[in-house]
Amino acid sequence: MLYTIKHRVSGAVLFSLGCGSFKLCVEAAVKSGADLRDANLGGACLRGADLGGAYLGGADLRGADLR
């Protein structure tokens, strides 16, 4: 399935990837060095995701599962 991470205000595509889950898409974005400032990650299930090194300034993380 194709997952897309979009800018929270403009809706511009920041990163997209065909993979098994949105969590894997976010991890791949972080690993590739994608700029995730102002990303719309609200409500995402990111439980156990490796976000080390990610810059998420201004990102919408409301309701995201980050445990």
Description of each model-found segment:
Residues 1-60, 65-67:
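Extended, small-residue-rich solenoid/repeat segments and analogous flexible loops
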